[in-house]
Design a protein with these regions (language model features):
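S-adenosylmethionine/decaboxylated-SAM
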Residues: 2-231
Length: 231
């Protein structure tokens, strides 16, 4: 479909904007700002970053994606280029698998957005390779933290009594039902990989937001001595 900002077939991003303003607003307009996006698709998130955060003339974003025709979504690369044409000078495209492209990139980045392979291994691998590229103080956002394969459908709605009891103890039945779905197919969802990565980075990050997406701020880096001698 064509909307008021470009040619898009899907809109999987706009509902994230309020949280992105909260998580990334302090970066807006900074000179020398650098962002890395793993999974760019039609360019909605790329466009939003260019228009709202990467507004300085020297701000740049590296976009990693296969950028190849897809049997379901067609030539989304052409739509990406059309939708982001006004910001072409800020964008560098890296066409290929993330595990090939990320090893060629040099940090540091202020912002990293991970929206690649929707599996535990894929999310873990992208996070492991991108984390060293993130600045201390930078923000990494994982998309689809609570994603489940579409074949599972919507979570089953519990009884009214069960919902009331969940609410009384401060829970959210929808989230809890979704988490049970995720547990049933954990290796096929990003959450297991993201949780595994962050477990290894305890003391090096703080979670700044967790819902369908999860965002963390890097609070410490690995010093050279630690990397070289902890063997």
């Amino acid at each position: 479909m064509t909307d008021d900002v470009g040619d898009f077939q899907e809109n999987w991003f706009e509902h994230n904007v309020p949280r992105w303003r909260e998580w990334l607003g302090s970066f807006s307009g900074r000179t020398g700002l650098r962002a890395l996006e793993i999974g760019s698709f039609e360019g909605r998130s790329t466009l939003w970053l260019c228009e709202n955060i990467l507004t300085a003339d020297d701000a740049r974003i590296d976009c990693v994606d296969f950028f190849a025709p897809d049997p379901v979504y067609g030539d989304y690369h052409a739509r990406f280029r059309q939708n982001t044409a006004a910001h072409r000078a800020k964008i560098r495209e890296h066409a290929g698998a993330s595990f090939d492209m990320l090893r060629k990139l040099e940090g540091p980045y202020d912002i990293v957005y991970v929206d690649g392979w929707h599996s535990a291994f894929g999310a873990l691998a992208d996070g492991v390779m991108a984390w060293p590229l993130l600045k201390v103080g930078g923000v990494m956002i994982f998309d689809d933290y609570l994603w489940v394969p579409p074949k599972l459908g919507e979570p089953e709605k519990p009884s009214g009594l069960s919902r009331r009891l969940t609410k009384l103890r401060g829970g959210d039945w929808r989230r809890e039902a979704r988490l049970r779905q995720i547990d049933s197919v954990a290796v096929d969802t990003p959450k297991l990989g993201v949780d595994g990565l962050l477990a290894t980075l305890r003391g090096y990050h703080e979670v700044i937001g967790s819902d369908y997406q999860l965002a963390v701020r890097k609070t410490r880096g690995f010093d050279q001595g630690q990397v070289g001698h902890d063997t």
